[in-house]
Regions:
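Second-shell loop/turn segments in exported
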Residues: 69-81, 141-149, 195-200
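Short hydrophobic-acidic sequence motifs that mark active-site Asp/Glu residues
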Residues: 61, 111, 193
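Disordered inhibitory propeptide/activation segment of secreted metzincin zinc metalloprotease zymogens
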Residues: 1-81, 90-91, 181-185, 212-256
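Acidic glycine-/aspartate-rich tracts in secreted/extracellular proteins
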Residues: 67-69, 117-119, 169-172, 199-201, ...
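Post-HExxH zinc-binding segment in Zn-dependent metallohydrolases
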Residues: 171, 184-213
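Metzincin-family zinc-dependent endopeptidase catalytic domain
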Residues: 43-46, 80-187
Length: 256
């Protein structure tokens, strides 16, 4: 086993510490400031060699993974509480949200899953994890530790994870990691929901930049970000089912 100090140092390269040992588990942490860019910019995913954004008029269909709620004394009440929290997080993004969400137990794009036990390291415990835009099936995973947060912190955790679903990255994911590349669009002040600690708060600037990013991508005005092509993607329920059934379209946080 590595000495604890060495193990902690190595983990610094792998996890995104938000505050008080809270670490987002959706992506790894970046290191450098390519081309002298400030870390206070809107960062979007480019881990596949392109920037994936959702196609216009996309609706993501989700469902609960029922068996993951069976450990609750009242599974239906637990689902209702999570549904309310998820709805509040979506409402926080307001009309800047580039996609709609609808619950669908039959044909779904992602599941909301409650883990039965925490996932911890010397850096902290996972609160939640999400996914980036693509045509696969995914999970929005919530860990028990998230329910130990106070109300606003819990809400901000889900707002942050929904930011990943929209395609946003952490500030430290700024470009030049070959395995986890990102691209920069627009500018942010220090306070941002995709930033760290006390600065991890949803701002009007967050929403304005996200809205502008998608409007320009959908109109064709923006086709590349810093030389990396934008690719508009469709969800699983459109691309992952036989064509005759497809509906035509127009186009982790850890805590100590």
């Amino acid at each position: 086993m590595k000495p604890q100090a060495r193990a902690t140092e190595d983990l610094d390269d792998l996890v995104h510490v938000m505050d008080h040992g809270a670490v987002c588990d959706t992506e790894r942490r970046g290191h450098h400031r390519p081309q002298g860019r400030s870390p206070l910019d809107l960062v979007v995913d480019a881990s596949e060699g392109f920037v994936p954004l959702w196609e216009k008029d996309t609706t993501l269909r989700w469902r609960f993974r029922d068996r993951s709620f069976e450990s609750f004394a009242d599974p239906d009440a637990a689902k209702a509480a999570v549904r309310t929290l998820f709805g509040e997080a979506l409402l926080a993004w307001g009309d800047a949200a580039p996609v709609r969400f609808v619950q669908d137990n039959d044909v779904w794009d992602f599941e909301i899953v409650i883990r039965q036990s925490d996932e911890c390291s010397i850096k902290g415990c996972v609160l939640a994890s999400a996914f980036f835009p693509d045509g696969g099936r995914h999970k929005l995973t919530i860990y028990p530790k998230m329910f130990e947060q106070v109300g606003q912190e819990r809400l901000e955790t889900l707002i942050h994870e929904i930011g990943h679903i929209f395609g946003l990255r952490h500030f430290f994911a700024l470009l030049s990691e070959e395995d986890w590349p990102a691209q920069v669009f627009g500018e942010h002040r220090e306070v941002s929901i995709m930033n760290y600690g006390a600065n991890s708060q949803l701002t009007d600037q967050d929403k304005a930049d996200l809205r502008k990013l998608y409007e320009m991508a959908w109109s064709g005005e923006l086709t590349h970000i810093n030389g990396t092509p934008i690719r508009l993607v469709r969800p699983y329920h459109v691309v992952g089912i036989p064509t005759r059934f497809a509906i035509p379209t127009l186009g982790t946080v850890r805590m100590a």
